[in-house]
Amino acid sequence: MVENIGSGSAELVSYAKLNLYLDVLGKRSDGYHEIVGLFQTISLHDTLTVEICDRGFYLESSVALPSDNTIKRAWEMFRKNTGKEFGLKVTLKKEIPVGSGLGGGSSNAAAVLRYLGEVFKIPLEDLLNIAAQVGSDVPFFLYGGTALVRGRGEIVEKLEDIEGYSVDLFFPGIHSSTKEMYLSLTPEMYRKGPGRVEELHRAYLERNYEKIKELSYNVFEKVFLEKHPEVMDGLRNFGDGSIVKMMTGSGSVFFALYPLDKGNYSFVGGV
């Protein structure tokens, strides 16, 4: 979502995502892991104010970010792939916790790419190629809503958006390293999920709560809880009466799924 706010600036909304399903199928020859997942954006979001300038990159953030952050990489990869020369000023108001599995960094990058694509008239197909160079989850965020995601995250099949659900989130205050979590997986852990992602999507559309509970899966959840058993104490009092309670991404946030608007954050549709 882009809103012009005057003086050449624009305000961008950058939504968080949940993994309603996430499994690892194996390790690829390029070092990445092959995944399959059902991704969904939710109303929790960061806000970015962006302004194109003559040269340089300037970022003011409400939380500390590394110098090689995804927003800067998005700007660099966009310039490299399009040949456009310009600078960028960004002010980031963070609401999505860092290291939570909610995809905040990837979402920020996608929001910037989408904005630059509109400004410079770059087709979505080209933006998707740039997004894959920035990060594995970035292509999904160019679509948002509900999608089947495969490959290392760059293969995105837009699905009918799921509506009428909400979630509460439990953040245990632990920064979960995606790289460390992938390194913790062993071949015996691959392909352990039900694998019926399209069926899970259909269960959401049909409001088949028992089937949702049966087919929901995250390969990283068991690994994360083995590393951080203290999190179980907080989870015991979280998500009473929910349809399903599970972790998103490689951690550390857990979500409790509810029908309609019982939860604090609603499902958000895509483009």
Curated annotation (Swiss-Prot):
GO annotation, biological process: isopentenyl diphosphate biosynthetic process, methylerythritol 4-phosphate pathway; terpenoid biosynthetic process
Function: Catalyzes the phosphorylation of the position 2 hydroxy group of 4-diphosphocytidyl-2C-methyl-D-erythritol.
Residues at the active site: K17, D137
Keyword Mitochondrion in annotation: no
Superkingdom field: Bacteria
GO molecular function: 4-(cytidine 5'-diphospho)-2-C-methyl-D-erythritol kinase activity; ATP binding
Reactions mediated catalytically: 4-CDP-2-C-methyl-D-erythritol + ATP = 4-CDP-2-C-methyl-D-erythritol 2-phosphate + ADP + H(+)
Gene of this entry: ispE
UniProt-recorded name of the protein: 4-diphosphocytidyl-2-C-methyl-D-erythritol kinase
UniProt similarity note: Belongs to the GHMP kinase family. IspE subfamily.
Residue sites binding ATP per the record: P97, V98, G99, S100, G101, L102, G103, G104, G105, S106, S107
Biological pathway: Isoprenoid biosynthesis; isopentenyl diphosphate biosynthesis via DXP pathway; isopentenyl diphosphate from 1-deoxy-D-xylulose 5-phosphate: step 3/6
